[in-house]
Amino acid sequence: MKVILISGKAQNGKDTVAAYMREKLTEDRHRVLITHYADLLKYICRSYFGWNGVKDENGRKMLQYVGTDVIRKANPSLWVDFVALMLKYFHENWDYVIIPDCRFPHEVSTMRESGFDT
């Protein structure tokens, strides 16, 4: 399994690039997953804090507070460790995994240290 990490500024097309890559790779019959380090954060905010999924000013504040001020302060690598663990468990399900929200150097190094071809 190859892991493709995409980094860039907010609202600059990272998810669009990931979707295009998935389209082209699946045309060649590759199994492709797009996932985000922030998927677990969004799930937590929806399930535990009633977030409606809208990234308006209040939504962004909630995501930042829970993701950075609480979780990242307690465990800076929780988000990337969770994704790496899930990919280890289910590595046979995909040929490519695309992660379009890579922001920090440890997100790259954790994937490499976990043995993924990045």
Where are these regions (language model features)?
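Extreme N-terminal starter segment of soluble prokaryotic enzymes
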Residues: 1-4
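P-loop (Walker A) phosphate-binding loop of NTP-binding proteins
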Residues: 8-9
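Active-site signature of alpha/beta-hydrolase-fold catalytic machinery across serine-
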Residues: 20
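Conserved phosphate-donor/acceptor-positioning beta-strand/loop module used by diverse small-molecule
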Residues: 96-103, 110-118
